[in-house]
Every structure is written in C-alpha cells, then in structure tokens.
Amino acid sequence: MAETEKIEVRDVTRIERIGAHSHIRGLGLDDVLEARLVSQGMVGQKDARRAAGVVVQMVREGKIAGRCILLAGEPSTGKTAIAVGMAQALGTETPFTSMSGSEIYSLEMSKTEALSQALRKSIGVRIKEETEIIEGEVVEIQIERPASGTGQKVGKVTLKTTEMETNYDLGNKIIECFMKEKIQAGDVITIDKASGKVNKLGRSFTRARDYDATGAQTRFVQCPEGELQKRKEVVHTVTLHEIDVINSRTHGFLALFSGDTGEIKQEVRDQINNKVLEWREEGKAEINPGVLFIDEVHMLDIECFSFLNRALESDMAPVVVMATNRGITRIRGTNYRSPHGIPIDLLDRMIIIRTVPYSEKEVKEILKIRCEEEDCIMHPDALTILTRIATDTSLRYAIQLITTANLVCRRRKATEVNTEDVKKVYSLFLDENRSSKILKEYQDDYMFSEITEEVERDPAAGGGAKRRVEGGGGDAQPMEH
C-alpha cells in the first residue's frame, strides 16, 4: 500500500513589519485644519497637530523655503509621531528625509557633507519631458527566429485603435522587450519611440472571454481611441542629491544603488544649481522644496548649528523640522548652556511647536490603536490595567507589553488577553523605576558601582589617607584632609 505524503503548509512571514509609528496614516485634520480627537492613528495634541497642519500646507504651496520648526516636549509626548504624520499627509510626491542627530558623525564623511546631502535629498525637481509614444491593442504579432538560434530576430506587429490599424516592423531590441513582457494578441501596450521601452497596460475587454480563468494580476482595459502615435508629457521627479551623485565623476550612476557616495565637490553642486534654475526659467522643471526632519537635534554640535544657520538662508533650502526632549542644557562642543541645547541665534530663526503629556483617556486610545495594529484582542479590564501601567511608568513600556502579553495569551491557547496575562508580563519585564530601585538596593553586588561612603585605609598598607572608589572606572583617588 502506497504511503500518503504529508504536506506541511507554513505561513509566509509578512514583509511589512509593525513599527513604533506604523499605525499613523496622517495628522488627523479636517478641511479647515481643525484636529479631530482620534483620527488617522493620531490621538490628542490638538494644538501641535494643527500647527503641523499649517506647516504641511506651507510645504504643499512650495513658495516658502528655508523655514525651521522645532518640536519641543517631554519624552513620550508624540514628537516623532507628528513628524511621521506630516510625512504621510504630504504623500510620496513631496520629498521627506528623516534622520537622527547622531547620524552625521562618521569617519568616512564630514559632518557638513552629511548635512548637505540630507538637505539636498529633501529638495525635489520635477522635470517635464514630451515623448512620442505608440499606444494600441495588439491584433497580431509575428517573430521570425533564425534556424541556428543565433543572429538577429525580425518581426511584425499589427496594432489598432478604435479608428485605425497599422503594421509595424520590429527590430531586435523591441522584440527582446516584447518577449520579456510576454506580449500576445489582445494586449493593450505602449511603445516609447525614443527609448524603445514597452509597457503592458492590460488585456482588451474584447478578449475577456478568451480564457475561462485568469489570474488576479490580469487587468482589463478599453481599446485606445484616436491616433496610434501620440505625444505625451512625462514628469520625472528626482531629488537634487540624486542629480549630484549621477554627475559626480568619482562615483557616477552606480553610487545610487551602492549608497557609497562619499564627498561631493561644491563646484558640482553649484553647476547643478545653476542648471536647475535655468530649467525653471525655461519652464522645463519645477523645484519642489520638501521636508528634512532631524530627531534628537540636541546631539548636533556647534559647527553643525553654524552650518545650518547659513544653509537655511539659501534659496535651495527645504523646510527643516527638528525635535528635542531636552530643557536648558549644554550646547555640544561648548561650555555654554541654552534652551534645548540649541544656540540662541538659531532658536531665533525657529518657530517652536510644543507637545504636552497625554491624559489617561488619550493614553487608553493610543493603546487601543496599537492593539488593533498588532492584531491583539484585549479585554477591557486588561486595557485599563495597561493604561494604569502607562501612566505610572511610560507609554513606550506599556506598548511593548502588548506583544508580550499576546504571546502569553496564545501560549495558553486563548484568543483574548486578560488581566492575568498583563500582570504576568509586568512581573517578568521591569520598567525603569523598578530597575533603578533594585540597583539601589543591590548596588554593592554589581561591578564598578559607586561607593559614596568613605572607607578608612588600613594603616598597615601604608599611609592614613582616606580613599574612595569613583563610579565607572573603579580608580581609587586620595582625598585631601
């Protein structure tokens, strides 16, 4: 008797990973820029969201560039969330570059070069180009291959619209494109005459009954109308940084894919700026200033702030949004203290948006949205306990407990997370306050812990000087009497 084969079916892991802000779809504003309480994944912070909505409107108009906005507030008040909401509201057409303040420190590249590249990544250029295309439905296609298998292929294709039908002779390059796209009779295609690119739009509705079953990717379209040969305006959107890389002699086009751009000369950038301004005067191109978001801006030093002072006054500058959670602190690279760790002359160029701590009701709404995002069904009582944990500790800690509580729930073959699951993970994973309390209680058992009490040195060891161990290094230093 033949053995029956067992087929094991496994779920393919999703490519879309759930991130800290993947639930945000926009700023949650209505047509008159009034913030809704809960909308598009955003909760609370009505004033900050409305101010961010005004900035988004300013960026969309594209008339004002070089403005600087600072998002200032305590930790876990949604500064990065507002920046992500701005990126979602602007859409894919507007360049949005996100970076951290510590990303600019590298051995391969200077700090000013890293900032220059980030600024130029945030400025888009829409280049308009008129191309001649052939658009029609394939009636018949004939390709003659040499008997030897090598040599030039020749062929003919018959294309039609609702008004006319024409035969075209095909060259070797176009035939390769046809074979690659798997073009057959009944397909609606476009051929770019300048580049020879073949694009398959779909199947004609007249051929809908050719097959009893078709795949989900099969798309049915109408047969094109009018002339076969048409002129079409194509808009290419590129960033200034991409143009810089392509025109850089040392790296060239391949650096776009490898990412190894290195230093780009200022002369190259100046020439590109002049050319882009020429195209704008001739109507061939439009400059689209985007947004550069710098998180943890207090990590920049005085040289970077000095560079930004000058860069923001340029015509080719994007809108720069910065975020920080520091109060009055030292400016990196100096001994001077200032608000948010930013020099006063740069603060004078900024408009500041303040974020306030979330209320308990708003925290509960955020946790509910995160549960939906992470496919976690949570009992209302468990959600109440998690909200209490978030208000007592931090919102980030409570969000991290959602997935762990869901795993504990699945381990006991249940579908809904209850209060016992939340209590279990709360006891397993410590928050900052409980961890600090344990460290203070058992600090003598840890290595290199700070000993504040002074210990009398043994006279037999030589000398009667008092010594103490400093935290971090463990070096004993003599104390002066």
From Swiss-Prot:
ATP binds at residues 73-80. One of its GO terms (cellular component) is Ino80 complex. It catalyses: ATP + H2O = ADP + phosphate + H(+). Keywords: ATP-binding, Chromatin regulator, DNA damage, DNA repair, Helicase, Hydrolase, Nucleotide-binding, Nucleus, Repressor, Transcription, Transcription regulation. SUPFAM superfamilies: P-loop containing nucleoside triphosphate hydrolases (SSF52540). GO terms for molecular function: ATP binding; ATP hydrolysis activity; DNA helicase activity; transcription corepressor activity. It is an enzyme of class 3 (hydrolase). One of its GO terms (biological process) is imaginal disc-derived leg morphogenesis. It is found in: Nucleus. Its EC number is 3.6.4.12. It comes from the Eukaryota. Higher expression occurs in primordia of mesoderm, anterior and posterior midgut and cephalic furrow early in gastrulation, as well as in endoderm and mesoderm lineages during germ band extension. Later in development expression is only maintained in endoderm cells. Expressed in thoracic and abdominal segment neural precursors of all embryonic chordotonal organs. Residues 453-481 are annotated as: Disordered. Disruption phenotype: Death at first larval instar. SMART domains: AAA (SM00382). InterPro entries: AAA+_ATPase (IPR003593), P-loop_NTPase (IPR027417), RuvB-like (IPR027238), RuvB-like_C (IPR041048), RuvBL1/2_DNA/RNA_bd_dom (IPR042487), TIP49_P-loop (IPR010339). Belongs to the RuvB family. Acts as a transcriptional coactivator in Wg signaling caused by altered arm signaling. Pont and rept interfere antagonistically with nuclear arm signaling function, and are required to enhance or reduce arm activity, respectively. Also an essential cofactor for the normal function of Myc; required for cellular proliferation and growth. Forms homohexameric rings. May form a dodecamer with rept made of two stacked hexameric rings. Component of the chromatin remodeling Ino80 complex. Interacts with Myc and pont. This is RuvB-like helicase 2. It comes from Drosophila melanogaster. The lineage of its organism: Eukaryota, Metazoa, Ecdysozoa, Arthropoda, Hexapoda.
